[in-house]
Each structure stands twice: as C-alpha cells, then as structure tokens.
C-alpha cells in the first residue's frame, strides 16, 4: 500500500515539475527572451541546481527525505502561482532560480524514498527500472492539460471580443495566445495538488511508524 500510494503521488507531482520545465522555453519567448538568453537561463538552472541538490540531501539527513520532498512539492506549487503573475524578464530569471532550488533535490530524494520503501530489496534493479519508466511517462498529463486550458482560454478571449480563430488577424491571435499562456501554466498546479493530497494525506496513513521516519 505505501508503495502504490507513493508511486501515484510521485507520478502526479513529478508530472507538474517536468511540465513546468518543458513549458519554460515558450513562456520565456513570450516575454521577449531570445535563444541566447534561454540557453543562459537553462544553464543557470543546472549550475545552481547542483549545490541546492546537495543542500536538500544534507537537510534530508536532519529532517528526513519525506519532509524535504514535501517541501519541494510546496515550492513547485508556489512556482505555478508566481509564473501566472509573471510579466517581465526579471521575474522570469527569478522563476529560473526558484526552479533551481528544488529541481534536483525533489528528483534525487524522490528516488531515495522509492528505494527505502521497496518491499523486496533483492529486486531493486528491476523496480528502479520501472520507477524510471514512470518518471519518463509522467510528462504526459501536464502538457495536455496546459494545451487544453490554454486553447479554451484563448477561444473564450476571442469570443469576448466577438472574434473567432478564422476571423481574427494573425497579430490578434498571437496576442491572445500569449495572454492565455499564464492560465495554462497555472493549471499545472492542479496536477501537483493531486500529488500533494496523496503525498501529505494518503501516504502517511498507509505507512508504518518506521516508514514515516524516512
């Protein structure tokens, strides 16, 4: 039971993490960031990600991996809200730093938690293979949700102006798509919330006392 609850929670919250990462390029472009700036932003996340990941690991020794993963989930929920209100490049750079603070830590400690919850340690290689597949398949729901919400919002904005995709000019469509983008990003919080409910609400109830100390 703990393993099943954890896998479903992980699938949800890590989907949100991967979606925010994959959508960052289009969001930065909408704010006027060129390809060189985007490359620099991605590099910044990687450079800052390593020391913050090590910090997560160090704090996990004191507070436990479960607590630190929970902290990372909360950080990414805040990132969704912050991204929704973001409208300038300096805020985008702040967003990159925020992502860097938790990206490596939440991924590394999620894997560590999975290893500690394994009921059969002898089959750890096989189980970690399945875990990696879960991680790679987890970026499916998020992009789909972002696309649906963005399209719905854009169509609503067009209708409010008495327009359709067929009657609007290319400039109008581009402007409305850019305006609808933040709503798509905000929708990612729904997936992370599902993971958070399972992680904070369901998982502790099915864990043993020893497992709660992880």
Name the predicted role of every residue range.
Residues 67-82:
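Structural signature of the two symmetry-related core transmembrane helices
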């Amino acid at each position: 039971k703990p393993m099943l609850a954890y896998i479903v929670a992980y699938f949800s919250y890590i989907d949100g993490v991967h979606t925010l990462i994959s959508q960052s390029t289009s969001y930065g472009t909408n704010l006027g960031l060129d390809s060189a700036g985007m490359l620099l932003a991605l590099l910044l996340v990687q450079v800052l990600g390593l020391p913050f990941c090590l910090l997560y690991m160090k704090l996990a020794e004191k507070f436990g991996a479960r607590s630190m993963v929970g902290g990372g989930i909360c950080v990414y929920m805040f990132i969704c809200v912050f991204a929704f209100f973001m409208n300038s490049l300096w805020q985008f750079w702040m967003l990159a730093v925020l992502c860097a603070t938790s990206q490596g830590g939440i991924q590394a400690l999620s894997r560590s938690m999975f290893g500690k919850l394994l009921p059969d340690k002898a089959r750890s290689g096989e189980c970690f293979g399945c875990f990696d597949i879960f991680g790679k398949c987890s970026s499916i729901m998020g992009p789909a949700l972002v696309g649906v919400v963005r399209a719905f919002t854009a169509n609503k904005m067009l209708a409010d102006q008495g327009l359709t995709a067929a009657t609007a000019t290319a400039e109008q469509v581009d402007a409305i798509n850019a305006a609808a983008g933040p709503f798509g990003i905000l929708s990612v919080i729904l997936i992370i919330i599902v993971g958070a409910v399972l992680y904070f609400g369901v998982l502790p109830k099915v864990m043993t006392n020893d497992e709660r100390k992880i």
